[in-house]
Amino acid sequence: MLREEAAQKRKEKEPGMALPQGHLTFRDVAIEFSLEEWKCLDPTQRALYRAMMLENYRNLHSVDISSKCMMKKFSSTAQGNTEVDTGTLERHESHHIGDFCFQKIGKDIHDFEFQWQEDKRNSHEATMTQIKKLTGSTDRYDRRHPGNKPIKDQLGLSFHSHLPELHIFQTKGKVGNQVEKSINDASSVLTSQRISSRPKIHISNNYENNFFHSSLLTLKQEVHIREKSFQCNESGKAFNCSSLLRKHQIIYLGGKQYKCDVCGKVFNQKRYLACHHRCHTGEKPYKCNECGKVFNQQSNLASHHRLHTGEKPYKCEECDKVFSRKSNLERHRRIHTGEKPYKCKVCEKAFRRDSHLTQHTRIHTGEKPYKCNECGKAFSGQSTLIHHQAIHGIGKLYKCNDCHKVFSNATTIANHWRIHNEERSYKCNKCGKFFRRRSYLVVHWRTHTGEKPYKCNECGKTFHHNSALVIHKAIHTGEKPYKCNECGKTFRHNSALVIHKAIHTGEKPYKCNECGKVFNQQATLARHHRLHTGEKPYKCEECDTVFSRKSHHETHKRIHTGEKPYKCDDFDEAFSQASSYAKQRRIHMGEKHHKCDDCGKAFTSHSHRIRHQRIHTGQKSYKCHKRGKVFS
């Protein structure tokens, strides 16, 4: 009896161990989460809840109304565990709780622990099913005995009269630290914010020492009282979890697609469509303060700004080349790896860029979404349209400060600058020739291997690169879409038109250092330079004849093959050379484009006009070495 009084005095001195004042049911202590709230808890918070539920039900299972309750109190010091003090507390009250079966609760605890471990092993999300099963044990008793006092109320009187004793079983060492860590993690990680219509749970401050209970109560109250901060921009609906917001967006946006009225492209968010629509409207709200250039996206402005600052933060680990954009670095890396992740489903051709695949796919579909407003011609790629619009004088022109040559886009002039800077990074290992771009080296390499992957479906002729095939196809179709605004002459390719325009402007930016002769294009200068060096790089494999020009080599080959690809529809006559075909066409059509400036006489060919002009000038260029006589 004295021992019991001493134990009672020690218990009263300990802070927070006073018995509860007033009636408290078991339901008030057993905190429950709804399914929506449960999904918002992270694994550490769920583990904390599990520990609380198991602790409560184990204590409930251990209560024996008619027996004594043994209590062990563990205390710790800085040096370690101290001696265990054991006391006996006899129960003075006895409560009859009917035929409630404590063994049933024990089985539910075992099933709950087993199911929890199975869910963890199978990486499944723990559900509330087993937790509800525990509280259902008391609910089922109440339904079976409607005449008796609710079991939860009776358990509340019995169970909570010993709550201070049960609290002593909670260790203040390792487990306490782990739970405290879980609570700290919960306060930092918890993002679920929700206003609940359910009544708030109030509990006496005397239970603050019950660490599990107070921690879970705090967690529960935070879930209830915080605002919803995750809002869907499309529907305006708010959520207390980012995961719930994502699920909502998938459901809401899954059936709601935004389609572009111009090109038919579909987007799942309205802001993406608005951004895309600027491509068609030409709207560019973002302006560079340095040069005044405008952009349709803020990210493009940020990337452009690095051109002024010279910042290139992205570096290739293979060749140390630096880039101003991360996307350019990723694209460049594929040169080293040889990766071509974008594959055509029709012909299985692979590409390094998604844009190249998109443009290539239009070859199969025949789609040409980019239309010229001047002439109505449509193109499969936007860059091709921009290049075409230069014919009409549309768009910004870029002028080279060194040779004053004009270009239709910034990329072309950047490549042109390398001519003056002699920046040639790519070298052919076979002949030692340098190239400004890797694509040029790839095309050049085919001259050594003899590879000609591009084939004409009309005549079966093959070519080293696609551009040559495109130019060749115009021979069969007769199409000449490029027209000179000065004289009305038409051409099959834009490069031919550019060369022709130099006749009217008189512009000849390329000068020969040997003889001072000037030319309107670099290729003509390179061809002329072979006259001084005597270089003849093109050799006939049949007769070993060499040529200084590739075109002469190609024309010569037809002597051996007998090929005559140029056919006159009027007289069913074929020619091996395009010039012969064109001359014959003028004869049939009566066209005489070449006019003498002195007498006004017109001729069908340029060579005929030159020969005629010698009559006026008196020039006699051809001399007989045997007799010394000269002729015009």
UniProtKB/Swiss-Prot annotation:
<keyword id="KW-0539">Nucleus</keyword>
<keyword id="KW-0862">Zinc</keyword>
<feature type="zinc finger region" description="C2H2-type 7">
    <location>
        <begin position="398"/>
        <end position="420"/>
    </location>
</feature>
<feature type="zinc finger region" description="C2H2-type 2">
    <location>
        <begin position="258"/>
        <end position="280"/>
    </location>
</feature>
<comment type="function">
    <text>May be involved in transcriptional regulation.</text>
</comment>
<feature type="zinc finger region" description="C2H2-type 10">
    <location>
        <begin position="482"/>
        <end position="504"/>
    </location>
</feature>
<feature type="zinc finger region" description="C2H2-type 8">
    <location>
        <begin position="426"/>
        <end position="448"/>
    </location>
</feature>
<feature type="domain" description="KRAB">
    <location>
        <begin position="24"/>
        <end position="99"/>
    </location>
</feature>
<feature type="zinc finger region" description="C2H2-type 3">
    <location>
        <begin position="286"/>
        <end position="308"/>
    </location>
</feature>
<keyword id="KW-0238">DNA-binding</keyword>
<keyword id="KW-0832">Ubl conjugation</keyword>
<dbReference type="InterPro" id="IPR036051">
    <property type="entry name" value="KRAB_dom_sf"/>
</dbReference>
<dbReference type="Pfam" id="PF00096">
    <property type="entry name" value="zf-C2H2"/>
</dbReference>
<feature type="zinc finger region" description="C2H2-type 14">
    <location>
        <begin position="594"/>
        <end position="616"/>
    </location>
</feature>
<dbReference type="GO" id="GO:0006357">
    <property type="term" value="P:regulation of transcription by RNA polymerase II"/>
</dbReference>
<dbReference type="GO" id="GO:0000978">
    <property type="term" value="F:RNA polymerase II cis-regulatory region sequence-specific DNA binding"/>
</dbReference>
<dbReference type="InterPro" id="IPR036236">
    <property type="entry name" value="Znf_C2H2_sf"/>
</dbReference>
<keyword id="KW-1017">Isopeptide bond</keyword>
<protein>
    <recommendedName>
        <fullName>Zinc finger protein 860</fullName>
    </recommendedName>
</protein>
<comment type="similarity">
    <text>Belongs to the krueppel C2H2-type zinc-finger protein family.</text>
</comment>
<feature type="zinc finger region" description="C2H2-type 4">
    <location>
        <begin position="314"/>
        <end position="336"/>
    </location>
</feature>
<dbReference type="GO" id="GO:0005634">
    <property type="term" value="C:nucleus"/>
</dbReference>
<dbReference type="Pfam" id="PF01352">
    <property type="entry name" value="KRAB"/>
</dbReference>
<dbReference type="GO" id="GO:0008270">
    <property type="term" value="F:zinc ion binding"/>
</dbReference>
<feature type="zinc finger region" description="C2H2-type 6">
    <location>
        <begin position="370"/>
        <end position="392"/>
    </location>
</feature>
<feature type="zinc finger region" description="C2H2-type 5">
    <location>
        <begin position="342"/>
        <end position="364"/>
    </location>
</feature>
<feature type="zinc finger region" description="C2H2-type 11">
    <location>
        <begin position="510"/>
        <end position="532"/>
    </location>
</feature>
<feature type="zinc finger region" description="C2H2-type 13; degenerate">
    <location>
        <begin position="566"/>
        <end position="588"/>
    </location>
</feature>
<feature type="zinc finger region" description="C2H2-type 9">
    <location>
        <begin position="454"/>
        <end position="476"/>
    </location>
</feature>
<keyword id="KW-0677">Repeat</keyword>
<feature type="cross-link" description="Glycyl lysine isopeptide (Lys-Gly) (interchain with G-Cter in SUMO2)">
    <location>
        <position position="220"/>
    </location>
</feature>
<feature type="zinc finger region" description="C2H2-type 12">
    <location>
        <begin position="538"/>
        <end position="560"/>
    </location>
</feature>
<keyword id="KW-0805">Transcription regulation</keyword>
<feature type="zinc finger region" description="C2H2-type 1; degenerate">
    <location>
        <begin position="230"/>
        <end position="252"/>
    </location>
</feature>
<keyword id="KW-0804">Transcription</keyword>
<dbReference type="InterPro" id="IPR001909">
    <property type="entry name" value="KRAB"/>
</dbReference>
<keyword id="KW-0863">Zinc-finger</keyword>
<keyword id="KW-0479">Metal-binding</keyword>
<dbReference type="GO" id="GO:0000981">
    <property type="term" value="F:DNA-binding transcription factor activity, RNA polymerase II-specific"/>
</dbReference>
<dbReference type="InterPro" id="IPR013087">
    <property type="entry name" value="Znf_C2H2_type"/>
</dbReference>
